[in-house]
Amino acid sequence: QLMDDAWQALLQASGGETVGVSLVNPSQADRREVLTVSDRPVLVQVPAMAAKSLTDAVFDPEHPVHVQRGRDAIRMTNGLVDVCIDTRDGLVNSIVDLVSDRELLLSGQRANRLVLHPDYPDCFDAWELQQQYRHSGDPVDRVTDLRVTESLLRAQVRVERHAGQSSFVQTITLDADSRAVEFSVDVDWAERARVLKVDFPLDVAARSSRDEIQFGHIERPIEANTSWDDAHFESCGQQWMLLAEPRYAVALVNQSSYGHDVSPAGGDEHTPTMGVMARLTLLRSPQSPDPHPDQGCHHLVYSLLTDARVESAHVEAARLNQPLQVRSGTVELPSTARIEPVHGTAVIDAVKQAFDGSGDLVIRIHEAEGARSRVRLLLDRDGCVSEVDLLEDPIDEPTQQLPASTCSRVELTLRPFQILTLRVSQR
């Protein structure tokens, strides 16, 4: 209701038309993606923190999707990414980055495999996960139905499964002009004392994972060389996990599945694979204090982003977590604020009115790479920009050299993971 009221206020304030359709981008990233409008896919482009009429936002794809159907395999490709699904088990047996010309899955391995593990913590069922669950697991491989839908903008493979007391519907999606493969699973969950994981055996020689946290990311080792490392068998990240080797990386981006683990994948001392097994924790079913937690239907979404960087991982995370909004009425609103990188990466975390009711605009950003960065902040209005603290009070020793006169563009120099709050005043 709050968003509906805000949209109606925007329509009235901007003199927009009540007919037609507009797209609203609530995120800090420019978006170019396939969106379903009136039950049909369209490729749209909307600037960061802006609104655009649907008519002006639609584009033709540069890399349309094509599907090849074989006896035992279905291949989806858009000229950027090639995905192959084995029709016998509905699992992904190949993901090729066509731009970098490399296979992303370990040889002979399958991705997007659901596995049910026993889950019996010694105590505190709902809060603890113990690594004994790794010693056994039941793959959810049996296919009850498999269907394919395709167009030049989007191809999907839908796989239905049943295991234990639960049913699963997995969907694998490849969109035009996209370097990400999207996965979703609809679960009717009825398990007891089990944990559901999904596997991605990746041919990436990563020594550590970078997991997003608020205002940055944390780097965690993959090899368990110490008892401390061994105790980190399950980690928490927010929207993405980046796995990198020199000159290449992939990212697992999620919508709500924050728990994950990464370990060296397979092989032995004579034939090491140099890859990693990355797994997301999707659902659990502890028995205490609530004997029936999470029972029922769930819709979970995650994606694999090829040739990833911290910046592109943030953009993909915005696509999953801050979807474009389809609104009735036609209005054009420019970007309230956006970041233009010079070198490095910064992310806008908040754009809001000042607490004191002055009408000033407060913008909070952070440096996301963990390195020194230079960026430009572009505003939709002229204003006097000053640096404030988290409570929006002036600071005695500002970190930025900001112009004294009003402007709509400022240069910023950020320290690693620096959080910067700016106030834009019209006076």
Where are the regions that the model predicts?
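Amphipathic alpha-helical
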Residues: 2-3
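C-terminal (or distal) subdomains of carbohydrate-active enzymes
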Residues: 12, 17-427
